Amino acid sequence: MFRNAEEKDFALYMELAQEFYHSPAVMHPIPTQYMENTFREAMRSDVYIILRILEVDGEAAGYAILSRSFSPESGSPICWIEELYIREAYRGHGLGTKFFSSVRKEFPTARLRLEVEPENTGAVALYKRLGFTPLEYVSYVVEPDGADA
């Protein structure tokens, strides 16, 4: 049901990522080049990023991107759920719950973190049901010179 992406999945990943980044779940789309960079990095190594394809009965139901780091704040590894996209036809059937269960089994000592648009009420409800709680942080970012903001 959840498998690591392979080189042959490039077109599928690009299709799914385009769907995700043109959905109400995100604040704004990202350049296609960023998606391509993400796929290339996931194929190069799983040190920073893991790209999973979610399948139901052999059909692509979505994808997820995980990244790993260590947090001094929690004194433990962190597994960021960078992106989780489940196609509309597959929502509400427990796929998200099963995905998080598989992540928890794979990274049992890691703190799980994610970000969500408050308007994405279905995702917010899932995350709360799974025990996620909001952090009272404001995130800031600065892009490298020449990068799109």
Label for each model-derived stretch:
Residues 14, 18-40:
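Conserved GNAT-fold acetyl-CoA-binding loop/helix
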Residues 5, 84-86, 116:
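Hydrophobic adenine-recognition pocket in adenosine-nucleotide-binding enzymes
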Residues 51-53, 59-68, 80:
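Conserved beta-strand in the GNAT
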Residues 86, 92-105, 125-129:
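Conserved acetyl-CoA-binding loop-helix of GNAT-fold acetyltransferases
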Residues 76-88:
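Conserved acetyl-CoA binding element of GNAT-fold acetyltransferases
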